[in-house]
A protein has these predicted regions:
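Charged, low-complexity intrinsically disordered terminal segments
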Residues: 1-306
Length: 306
């Protein structure tokens, strides 16, 4: 995109409209955005928000381990539930199995918290590729319907800071306030219904953000929908000067990789920041197989060695 596509640091309405169409999500007002770096910064903020909740805490994560970090969160969630806050926890059991610490289910039960696994697996049922593939990779915390934290942080000692006895894995989260949080809550409600067959009250829908106001949108993929990929492909096609991508796993769909490659070939400065050490060797190997073609197109790839 060129400087003419923005006004005072804000994207033009036509750009917002196209992003909204591709994301299949309205652009809603954003009152505040804060970057939270790593668990050492994010986890205390998350726990303080849970302690401050008056009405509801909705918590969704790919990994909610039963280790020291998970138990600390379970305790804070339990305290909220005991003071009358509606607490709902949705976690992925397959993701949780990938880290040390075991299941968080018993700790949540002992704290009186309603914790539900998404698409649980059982040795009595066949482990089909569909059941293993369709997992809940989202990470969100929604407080009273008006404040949310989203990003890449899972609940495990791996993400906790060294001062908490954790491994301080590098990751990022965003704290968001404003009308856009309603769509984060809607995305949670949809996953909760898929996991439990229960419907949670729909959040109040608010009008779209006014023109030239700070706004955001929630691109919430479902099986068969590829809104996020559509947004990436379009952004890559529109980039004129630079395109910077950071991700834990470069296992994006082929059309997205092709869009990045095409941008580099037409002279856009395309730069990737990827992990040098990866907890999923197969994902790392798959990503590195794409390095040669991307670099041949002119992209630069940097690996984080922290």
């Amino acid at each position: 995109m060129s400087p003419s596509d923005s006004q005072g640091g804000l994207l033009r309405p036509a750009i917002i409209e196209e992003l909204s169409r591709r994301a299949a999500a309205p652009a809603r007002a954003v009152d505040e955005v804060r970057i939270l770096r790593d668990g050492s910064e994010a986890f205390p903020v998350m726990m303080d928000l849970i302690r401050s909740a008056h009405h509801s805490v909705w918590f969704e994560n790919f990994i909610f381990a039963g280790d020291a970090t998970g138990r600390r969160f379970a305790k804070v969630l339990g305290e909220a539930a005991r003071r009358g806050v509606e607490v709902r926890v949705l976690y992925d059991p397959v993701g949780t199995m990938m880290v040390k610490g075991g299941s968080i289910a018993s700790a949540l039960r002992s704290e009186g918290v309603e914790g539900r696994p998404f698409r649980p697996v059982s040795p009595l049922r066949p482990w089909t590729w569909s059941r293993l593939r369709h997992r809940d990779h989202r990470k969100s915390l929604i407080i009273d319907g008006h404040t949310a934290i989203v990003g890449g942080l899972c609940i495990s000692d791996n993400w906790a800071g060294h001062s908490e006895g954790g491994h301080n894995w590098r990751d990022t989260a965003l704290l968001v306030r404003g009308a856009v949080v309603r769509d984060v809550a809607t995305a949670f409600g949809n996953m909760w219904r898929r996991a439990t067959m229960e419907t949670v009250p729909a959040p109040n829908a608010e009008a779209a953000a006014p023109p030239h106001a700070p706004c955001g949108m929630v691109a919430a993929d479902q099986p068969g929908a590829h809104h996020v990929a559509s947004v990436y492909i379009w952004l890559a096609s529109q980039a004129q000067r630079s395109l910077e991508i950071t991700d834990a796993y470069l296992v994006t769909p082929e059309p997205v990789v092709a869009a990045f490659e095409s941008a580099a070939r037409r002279g856009v400065a395309v730069r990737f920041l990827l992990p040098g050490n990866n907890n999923h060797p197969f994902a790392a190997a798959s990503a590195r197989r794409r390095y040669a073609r991307l670099m041949a197109a002119g992209a630069r790839i940097y690996e984080w060695r922290g």
